[in-house]
Structure formats: C-alpha cells, structure tokens
C-alpha cells in the first residue's frame, strides 16, 4: 500500500529523561523514526524534554520543542502546531502514557488528531491488565492465573486461594516499577500498597508466580496489510522472575527445539495480529523447561529496549521501518537497507551469537539492594557478538568496564562456600561471576541447575570456559591452546594472567604466529545475499570481511555502557564528531559496545566495529584499519583511560596530547601548571597512605574533600570533618596506594559554576558559563545549572573566562575542555579540569546554537577557530534563560540514599527554557516530575549549621499559604525566632512520624538537610526513602528548595486585607 497522502504533519513524542528502565534506546528509535518520516516527505514536529539526545537536534525534525512532557505543555504545542497525526510508539512508556492522557482529556477528538502505529484500543489491551487477560482468553493463549486488584485486601484474598509465591505487576508503569515477587502475606501487603500508588490507574495484577520457567522474547513487526514477521527471538540466561532488562540475554534463542520455537513464534504473531499493531511489538513468554507448556507474560505495543537490542543484533532497523509502516507503507514494498536488495518482509537469519549483559549502578551505590527481581535496576547494557556463545559472553564481560577481563572476579576466591551458594541462589547483579566461581570450585552443573533453574546448556558453556582455563594452566606457551582460547573469546590479558606473563608477551606471541582476529559482517541474511553494511564484529576464523579503505580514516572511541556519571551525553558528542570527520573528507570509524545508542546505528559512521573498548580490542582494529589517528575526547572516561596505553603502542592520539591529558588528571602536575598560570585553587595535597592523608588534612584544616584520582562522576568522594572520619574513609572507601593516590582538598563552601571551552591551541571559544543552583558539595551532575548565569557579576564572569583561556592554552588543549569553579567572597578558584567533552556539551550546544563537538573535531583535524568564523573568548549570551535539571531513579533502587552530595546519583536530565528565571525553573521542575502544589503542608528537618537559612525559607513558604511542620530541634529553633511550626513525632511514633504522615498523604513536600559530616543517620534515610516511595517532592539542598519557592511565589497572587 502506498504511503498516506491525507496527512502532512506528524508529531513524534520523545521519551523524556533517562531513567532506569528507559534509557538511550529511545533516542536511537526516535532519531530513526523522525529521519524516516522526513525521508518520506512528511513535516515532523518533535517534543521531548531531554536535551542530551541526538533526537532533539534541529536537523532531526522540522520543528523541535524541548519542553516538559506534561499534558499542559504537550497540549499547548499541539494547539500551536495542529499536527494531523501523532506517533507515540517511539517514546517508550512516556510516549504511550502521554497518548492515553491526550485521548482521555478529549484533545485528540477535539482537534481531530489520529494516533499512528498503535491504536488506543491496542495500547489499552496490552497495558490494562484486565483487557489483556480477556484478549488472551479470546485467542486461547495461556496466561498465569491472575486477578486485578484495586485494594490490598483483594490481593490478600486472591493469594490465599492460589498460594504463594505470587507476582505483583502495577498497570501502566515502566521497567516493573512498584512490582515484585512475594513469598508471604507481609511482603504482598507492602508491595501491593506501593504498586497501587505508583500505578496511574491505581490497579495491580496479582498473578501466580512462574519463576523458574525459561523466559523467551519475540520481536515482531506487522503492517496495515497484515503482513507480519519475527525480526529476532531472544532467550534470557536467567529464568522468569528477573526483569528482562536485568537479565543476561542471548540471540538467537539457544535451547529451544524447532517445535518450541514454532509454537512460541505462532503465538507471538497471533497476538500482534489480534492487537492490530502497525509497527514493532515485543512479546515475552515463559516456557516450562520440562513440557510444551507456555504462558504469555506480557506484550509491549511499542518499540522497546528489546527492539533496540534486536535491531543491533540483526542489523534490521526496527524503528525506521515501524515509522514507515505507521504512514501506510508495507513490509513487502520497503527495501531492507542492510542488503539494499532484499525486502523488509525477509526474516533476518543469524550465523553468530549475540550476548547482552546489563550494567548496574552498584559500583556507585554500595548500600543499594542488589537482589534482582521483577523491578529493573540496570542503568545500561553492553552487547557483544561472537561465533559461539562462550566468545560473545566473554567479550560482553570485558565490555562492562567493572574491572574484569573475563567471567571471573578475583575477589570471590576468598569467600566461603556457604556465602557462594547463597549468592548463587539469590540472584544479584553479579550472579554470573558467582556461578563461574562455583564451577571453578568443582560444583557440578546439575547441582547448580537445581539451585538456580538456569538451563544446563548455559551452565555447560560456563564449564567449558573453565576447562579451557585448566588446559591453558597445563600447557604454558602452547600455540594450539592459545588458538583455542582465542577462538572462545579469551582476552590476551586473561591468558597472560594464567601463564604469569605480561599482556604484551601474549600479543607478541600471537603476532609472531600471525594469529589475528578477522572481522565478520552483520548482514541480516547469514551471508546468503551481498550486504552493503559496514557493520563488523571480531572472531578468530579464517576469512576477513572488513577491507581497509583507500581513504584516510579516523577512529572515534565511544563511551561504552550507560552508567551513572557517563550517560547518553557522551554518545551525543561521539555522533557529532563523526559528522565533522565525514564533512572533512575522512572515513569515520566508530568503535563501541552499547546497543542502545545512536552511535552504534550502522548508518551513522562509514564503518562500525561492535567491540569491547579495551586496549587489545582497539589495537586489533587499529592494526587492520591503520587510521590516521584516534579521537578519545568524546568517549568519556572510558576512552580517556585508553589514551596512555594506545599512545605507548605508537598510536597517534588526535587533539590534546597524552602528556597534557596527564597534566590535567595528575594532581601534582596539575597543581604545578596552575601555579605557573597564576590561577588559584583550593589548597590540597596528594596522599598515598593514611599517615600522609592525616598530615595533609592537619595542614589544610578541616573540613576537607577527599577522593581517589582518575574517576568520573565523583565516585567515592566525601566531605570529612575530623580525623576519625578521615581514618574511616581511608579504611572503607578507598585503598590508597602509590599507584592510586587519594586527593585531600580544602572544602570551600561557595557558589559553583562550570564552563565548556573549545580550543585550537592559540585561541579559545567559551560558548557559555553555567551557574549551579546548589552550592559546592553537590556533584555538578546532580546540580541544577542555569545559563546564562543570573547571580555572577560581570567581573567574575570575566575572571572565569580569563582563567579558562589561560588553562586551555597552558595545557595545550586541542578540542574540548571542561572547567569547574567555586566562588567565595568574590574570589574564583578552579576545582577541576577535564580535558575532554563533558556531560554538559549537548545542553550548551542546544542553548547557544554552537555545534560544540563538531567544532572541536574540526580543530582536532587541524582547522582554527578563525577558519570557522568564531571569535576568541566568551560567546554572546542568549536572551532566554535555560535550566538543566537532574533526574533521579531512586524509586527503582531500594536502600540507596537520595541525599545529594559529592558522589553523582542522577541518571538523566531535562531542560526548561523561557523568558525569565522563574518560568524556566517552573518548566524544569515540571519536566523532572517535581510538581509542587501551591499550598499544603511542608516538613522541615534541618541540620544545625543551616537552621538560620532554613528559617527564612520557612517564613516565605508560610507567606504563600503553606502550613509549616518540623521535627523537634528544628521546631524549637523556629519557635525561638518567632515562627510557630507544627511538631511532628520522632521516627517510630506511629501516628505522627514523618513516614506515616507521608503515607497518608498529609505532607506535600519535605526539606531535609544534614551537616557537613553527612553521617548515615537512619532516621534521615527513612524520612527520605518514604518521600521517594510516595512521590513527595524532597529537597536535600536548601538551594533547590529556594529555587522551587521562587517558582511558587511567582505563581502566587498577593492577597491582603485593605
């Protein structure tokens, strides 16, 4: 069927900020969809609140709105733009929920706007637990016994009838938010109460647990002519009971017989046809390992995380084709862009194995609840491709960047058998490593299967890896053993460990015997047809399919999996860098391991290598491609950490040189550089042991900020007030050593701001200064940032610009640089310099209109700012006010304290822009879901050192109609100063303590601060987690509360008696 002519203007709804459960895969999907619709001649309007995305670049759609994804704002944009249709299926759960809200509010009917892709009835049938159950019964598809409940009592009655364990699934939530497996009535009551609150329709499904079944997923496509096909089937390593986003996944399925595969395939196609979905859809099924019995678990009537994985695993561009299907094109008339000859109706065939392993944030959150269940906890994922399962699994392990080069954690060799068995049974994020350790200790795979319900096939593969390790131990320097290990994915580093040699020795041995990897193409058709895609993975076989180009090439290193501190912002910079390389006439090669991102879309670069970002894997690509040089500036700390070893191997690092990168990262060299440049910094010293650290702190004076050197996202950073705390920090948080010194700095409690600069070595362009709303002590990634600055004098801005210029030129910076400053008593100090692209690049690029990563790349390739038409110094400021606000995923991470501090905790960001600070702040708070009612009750529980400041805030809250409540000490202080506050009870005082008041809806906001010492006070943590669980706005920094107050005051009318 030809594309529709009756619609011209289509609105695409984005997925908003990155949170756990909804990450970069939607930037990838949305970007593909917008470009596909433009390609077909439609006018595309995009709405999204996340500035860190490629999708929100001006050239992706005809009009781009970076506005809050709330009914209020989306309605305004719709009324202004009057689109003919809306495509909501590429914006994740956010997009679907927005479509439902627009429909319920009558806006779609009122303006005669059509929904494309998935009809409302299908969204309802797939998402509303009752309707889904009815549909499955009509289709004769088995689902676990279940009931829909709207109260806790209904849940208890049902569970008593069918027996425990049961699973709770709240309706219309994302990534299993609020759900869980319950083994007792007590757990059921707690989880259901929470789930009902988090479900927008106050509805939960309670179902019989089928934990232990195999979990299988089918990614299916259908068009308006009812053509349907399976793009990819995937099998979870972990059985049902662990959210698929937290499971290790293999594609294609590994343990299904033909009969089982056909049975589940038929079920999936039957479901997508019944739902009449036009586009992509994901079906999750549970299969009994011992019979042909299966159950349908759920259906996502949209592009999802699994579709991004399926797209990258097969090369089949699901989102692009889904967008075209939505406007009437059919699968049998669209060409598959990979082969350029076959049609999209052709089901992909794979002659390789793909492994996906999730990346969890527990290296940042040591106290987080690590046990996995039906609620997702991973922030990102890695994917690896190999010719056998062992190879793809080991490549994925070393892609994770968690300090392992194999499926082995050396620290586990010391744990007791008892602890090992517990960890194998109770699945945590690192269960794979415990299983492998158990096999190394001689546990049989049959024993492990009965404990974990993981299929024997997978456990046998882990056993095979251990057998190869043993073979290597017995045959040191043996060429055949080396070849076998390489064929099954072993890294040079692991083989070197076993043979007690250096990694370079193994590399030399391989080269002397011409043992190199070859690169195979991902072609969707198992090499049956010629493919045109330059998309490759390495393996140790005979035939190489990747040929070095005759054009000069540049290799750009990506940033690996998304984790806290290194998010989609770095992928944004990578993609822009590639565009600039191509414009300059070079061939652009990307190397990355993250399946969710735009950079790993094969159409972005001239060549894509889907490989781990390790020295060995990068060198193998360099040996084959012989690029002119490598760019490491845009891949976050991942790429920067590879610079030294690549340079030592004779590779040309383009842009800022390795010794200059080192001067910015190495404490003593940096201090020396600042002294020479005449730039003040907080007093500080490096310490390699406890004694030195105590000596340094004594000299500098408490409080001090302590942290390890060479980290990203403020990992293991703390503010300490006395000797005891410093000793405690050194013993528990870091292992200080001469190789890994710790930094001890004077802690300056002042205003923070940061600058991104672009330098060609002679002149320096400063696109803008961002002022942080929260004072020093809160990580820059967790602060709200304002551009242009609202409270910095002209003189301070000039000083900042001057220091930035001196630094860029003094450190021989070519390309990007980020500098952070703290200002106290009109004195400007430099806190740190990062000689690379930072997480503020997308935001600043959007608000200034300067394509920063592209300009930086042009300078790296030899042009000057003058050539590009840019002046030296601070760029003219925008007339609008722009706010970048952090977004957190605390609802997904039990036992992670939401208190803000020097260690980064946010997973994403939103942006608010308007003509005044108050309006921009209002938009930023709305966009990150911190909606505060205009009156109500607010609780203050404040540390002694900030009570005076909190008092003035409390008075202002009272003036606009809030009732002030406070804990004992705070209430007493307020009373002394003449402000009466309602006293709340101590924790445990059942009727009147804060968690109880919050649970019963009596509290609209909480302001809770702790002293500099920031001790893990149990009461404070209970208060904070109750606010997070119940969705009550929580302010742990007074500056944020003050910003919110500014918004409320601006929306208030003055009401006075005459």
Swiss-Prot record:
It is an enzyme of class 6 (ligase). Its EC number is 6.3.4.16, 6.3.5.5. Pfam families: CPSase_L_D2 (PF02786), CPSase_L_D3 (PF02787), MGS (PF02142). Mn(2+) 4 binds at residues 832, 834. Residues 930-1058 are annotated as: Allosteric domain. Residues 402-546 are annotated as: Oligomerization domain. SUPFAM superfamilies: Carbamoyl phosphate synthetase, large subunit connection domain, Glutathione synthetase ATP-binding domain-like, Methylglyoxal synthase-like, PreATP-grasp domain. Keywords: Amino-acid biosynthesis, Arginine biosynthesis, ATP-binding, Ligase, Magnesium, Manganese, Metal-binding, Nucleotide-binding, Pyrimidine biosynthesis, Repeat. CDD domains: MGS_CPS_II (cd01424). SMART domains: CPSase_L_D3, GARS_A, MGS. Mg(2+) 1 binds at residues 284, 298. Large subunit of the glutamine-dependent carbamoyl phosphate synthetase (CPSase). CPSase catalyzes the formation of carbamoyl phosphate from the ammonia moiety of glutamine, carbonate, and phosphate donated by ATP, constituting the first step of 2 biosynthetic pathways, one leading to arginine and/or urea and the other to pyrimidine nucleotides. Belongs to the CarB family. The large subunit is composed of 2 ATP-grasp domains that are involved in binding the 2 ATP molecules needed for carbamoyl phosphate synthesis. The N-terminal ATP-grasp domain (referred to as the carboxyphosphate synthetic component) catalyzes the ATP-dependent phosphorylation of hydrogencarbonate to carboxyphosphate and the subsequent nucleophilic attack by ammonia to form a carbamate intermediate. This is Carbamoyl phosphate synthase large chain.
